[in-house]
Amino acid sequence: ERWHPTKLRIGPDTLKTFSQKADQLIRLQENDLFFIDVGPIFEQHEGDYGQTYTVGSNSQFEELAAAARDIFIEVQGHWRAAGISGIELYKIAAHEAAKRGLELNTKMDGHRLGDFPHGLFHKGSLIDCSETPIQNVWVLEILLKDPKQNLGSFFEDILI
């Protein structure tokens, strides 16, 4: 069971947000990157996880894929240490992306999870949350754009 459809983004489609349609003609290449976003339901409680992967041996793709995960870990560390708001989390994420020559796409802006459906509990985004997000309830989403390669990378997980 899942609360949202599984999303697969390949190559140029890695720049697209969750709501944008994938290009059905894009195929995984020998050297490529892609991300998968899954939204399972476990015992009526929602989960959400997304990560970028690479195939082949392109070090630029590997660095881009790692950047989304690394920025997530960095931002989550600030949240754990200082108990900062969702607004501040995304300011830090944008700063960390810029330090790497990347851009943060804030249309993938984090959200609350809960008992299915989570929309009954909160309809806003993490990026607009002025309070400190509660662990195991909020999802931090990092969608990056590499303007040089015109590709993206994505990482999301529950703040724990």
For the regions a language model picked out, list residue spans one by one.
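Active-site neighborhoods and metal-handling regions in enzymes and metal-associated proteins
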Residues: E1-I160
